[in-house]
Amino acid sequence: MTAPSLNDIYVARERIAPHVPPTPLMRHPLLDAESGLSIWVKHENHNPTCAFKVRGGLNLVASLTPAERARGIVTASTGNHGQSIGLASRLHGVACTVFVPDGNNPDKNAAMRA
């Protein structure tokens, strides 16, 4: 695997832009006051899956060829990655199966099914 080029990053941004709004970056005055610093928080919890991993799944599924999409996607996850792949698969009409470990958090399992 090679490192992505700057162009690869721009292409990925275009693929995911229709599905993920810009993530809010906010100041929190109480954190500033308590720390004596200027604290900025990037609120990934405002994304469709409430996690930054949504971008990777959307980019991956959007980049599949028609033949790859027809075969579907299989992945393994305990939560965030599975949610990302599930959402992206649903948006692009691709069949998806996510394997989870025995005893996985039921709330995470439900979120991946949603």
How should these model regions be labeled?
Residues M1-A114:
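PLP-dependent amino-acid enzyme catalytic core
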